[in-house]
Amino acid sequence: MCSHGHSHNCAAEHIPEVPGDDVYRYDMVSYIDMEKVTTLNESVDGAGKKVFKVMEKRDDRLEYVESDCDHELLFNIPFTGHVRLTGLSIIGDEDGSHPAKIRLFKDREAMSFDDCSIEADQEIDLKQDPQGLVDYPLKASKFGNIHNLSILVDANFGEDETKIYYIGLRGEFQHEFRQRIAIATYESRAQLKDHKNEIPDAVAKGLF
């Protein structure tokens, strides 16, 4: 068994099941910077990022992540800009490998297991949910404007390893990073200057 060297004592939240299917849209996957997603303690390198699928493929059992030497998994999920997250869904098997508890941390890039000894922004007790019918709301005060999410799977339902098929995030994109906006603005102005001679004088004076 691995020893990651962290502890916690915060009370987790109990979330009721949401009846019916497709009650929420978990479509924030398009705003995840997938190339930079990392998963610690995954048994197969690169498997962790594959559980962030489009909602229509959430029932796919061919791609999944399984923990390596104990039940813990730590996902570091950067976004392509600032986002507001309002809820999540997690699909596993209906057995002891399904995650039972997660701890969420916002805007802490490249977290390690040692970093998880700090207080989480939210803790959630999970239900065994092989069909993705349970929605777990996230705290608006904590996840209203973030650029990175870390998810620690802190416990499962009794197996040595944890297996996850799908993690869906719902919310909305807020805005791009300021640095990226500044670069785009600079490049746009540079292109205009390159074509200055093609712009009538009256218009050019108003632009430059």
Swiss-Prot record:
Lineage top rank: taxon: Eukaryota
Domain PITH: 17-189
Transmembrane intervals: none
A single cellular component GO annotation: cytoplasm
InterPro entries documented for this protein: Galactose-bd-like_sf (IPR008979), PITH1-like (IPR045099), PITH_dom (IPR010400), PITH_dom_sf (IPR037047)
PANTHER family (alphabetical): AD039 HT014 THIOREDOXIN FAMILY TRP26 (PTHR12175), PITH DOMAIN-CONTAINING PROTEIN 1 (PTHR12175:SF1)
Similarity-based family: Belongs to the PITHD1 family.
Protein name: PITH domain-containing protein ZK353.9
Organism: Caenorhabditis elegans
